[in-house]
Amino acid sequence: MGMRMMVTVFLLVVLATTVVSLRSNRASDGRRGIVNKLNDLVPKYWTECCGRIGPHCSRCICPEVACPKNG
């Protein structure tokens, strides 16, 4: 009887650990999706290119007020 109880407890622990792991992975995927959507809404090189020409930017992509012409 003791061995059967230990096996049952072990299987319950494994099952609980698996469920918690799967749920946390799904939650992190959701957060990653939200972050990716936000990144798509904001121009990729906004800070690198604002007010000057950067390595990935051929023109200023900020509004005129926030992007004074340099020289």
Swiss-Prot record:
The UniProt record lists the keyword Glycoprotein: no
Molecular functions (GO terms): acetylcholine receptor inhibitor activity; ion channel regulator activity; toxin activity
Modified sites of kind Asparagine amide: 70
Keyword tags: Amidation, Disulfide bond, Ion channel impairing toxin, Neurotoxin, Secreted, Signal, Toxin
Secretion signal span: 1-21
Tissue expression notes: Expressed by the venom duct.
Positions of the pro-segment in this chain: 22-44
Pfam families cross-referenced by the UniProt entry: Toxin_8
UniProt-annotated location(s): Secreted
Entry PTM: Contains 3 disulfide bonds. They are not indicated here, since framework IV presents two different connectivities (I-V, II-III, IV-VI and I-III, II-V, IV-VI).
Gene Ontology CC: one annotated term: extracellular region
Domains (record comment): The cysteine framework is IV (CC-C-C-C-C).
Family per record: Belongs to the conotoxin A superfamily.
Descriptive protein name: Conotoxin Bu24
Source organism (scientific name): Conus bullatus (Bubble cone)
